[in-house]
Amino acid sequence: MNGGYEICAGEQMDDPVVADHFGKMWRHSPVPESALVDDWFDRTMAFIADARAAGTFLTYLARSHDEIIGSLAAQQFAGLYPDVIRHEYRRYAYVWGVFVCPAHRRQGIASALMRRSLDDMRPLGCSRVLLHASVMGSPVYEGLGFNATNELKLDLVA
């Protein structure tokens, strides 16, 4: 146990907590709650089930005593376009859900979750890890060696 918490791999029985944390992550973001679809939990659980069935899903939990105080979800990234590059050159992982309960933030928990996931991604042959960070989360990831890329965006909806 590190600083009153421990990091462990999540199991299928933990998926509802990971899905709940994913919803909380969005509710703690600048996205208005009204933007979330009503069935966000069911959609997240279905997404997780598909990723688990494909064998590409990793989850990690931060536990303090018997309470889950944080989680991370990641998976092999299939990409946004046809995969024509050999896997040894381009086998990406995508971290899509890092959440730490507000009362436990600023204690290194998100960094510990990330370090554990990175340790497990390397032996899987991942060549790069991608994520999208909130303003609050960016310093955490930059401290782990992540850097800004050439991704550009254009908001078409005001």
Language-model segment annotations:
Residues 46-61, 94:
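A short helix-loop-beta-strand connector motif used in the catalytic cores of GNAT acetyltransferases and
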Residues 6-20:
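A short beta-loop-alpha structural element at the N-terminal edge
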Residues 79-82, 130-136, 142, 147-158:
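Conserved catalytic-core motifs of GNAT/GCN5-like acyltransferases
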Residues 104-116:
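Conserved acetyl-CoA pyrophosphate-binding loop and the N-cap/start of the following alpha-helix
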Residues 86-102, 154:
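Conserved acetyl-CoA binding element of GNAT-fold acetyltransferases
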Residues 61, 67-76, 94, 99:
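Conserved beta-strand in the GNAT
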Residues 26-47:
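Conserved GNAT-fold acetyl-CoA-binding loop/helix
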Residues 121-133:
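Conserved GNAT acetyl-CoA-binding A-motif
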